């Protein structure tokens, strides 16, 4: 389950508004944008918890980190943030009784240097995120990066695997991608969620397709 910004017209338009005027536009659109992301993620999670071996590229908790840092910076006010928290908690509670529970067996945190992250954002090529047009976005990106670093230190809801994104370019280099997949699958073996035999089969299949 992927976060498809370009394929979701509603969120794409809201993101444009969110970015268009820096802090001012974050204050006017931050709450509704985060609720939109929360709703989209909840819809994905409702489907994922009914499946075995589902993988999501984000989570309700990850969305909460974004909303929390906007609130901490005064870009979401107390009333709106309390509404957001109530919605988030209700959504999580609604999936907790599902067959595979609403919490992941394993969460993966891609830790990345702030400057490297900005380079990746620029390479992604979304005009609304371009720091050449909006240099004030650098401080915003750095703030988000730090918020996730702090979140990772206190995360206890499931096992967390931290992957050094500065070391692995798994987008452009298959060997890096396989190294990261090996780490993830080995952790699943350690947790009893994947058998050693199946892990070996998966590694062999990847070797054949390289």
Describe the residue ranges of each PLM region.
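Hydrophobic/aromatic beta-strand patches that form the interior of the parallel beta-sheet core
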Residues: 1, 54-56, 106-108, 161-163
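Conserved substrate/cofactor phosphate-moiety recognition/catalytic segment
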Residues: 1-34, 39-40, 67-69
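Conserved nucleotide-binding/hydrolysis micro-motifs of P-loop NTPases
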Residues: 6-7, 60-62, 112-117, 167-169
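Short, solvent-exposed polar/charged micro-motifs at secondary-structure junctions
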Residues: 9-14, 108, 170-175
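A basic- and aromatic-enriched beta-loop-alpha substructure that forms the phosphate/nucleotide-
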Residues: 33, 38-79
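Conserved catalytic network of the ASCE P-loop NTPase/AAA+ motor domain
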Residues: 46-49, 97-102, 153
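A glycine- and Lys/Arg-enriched "phosphate-lid" helix/loop adjacent to the NTP-binding pocket
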Residues: 66-146
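NTP-dependent small-molecule kinase module
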Residues: 122-210
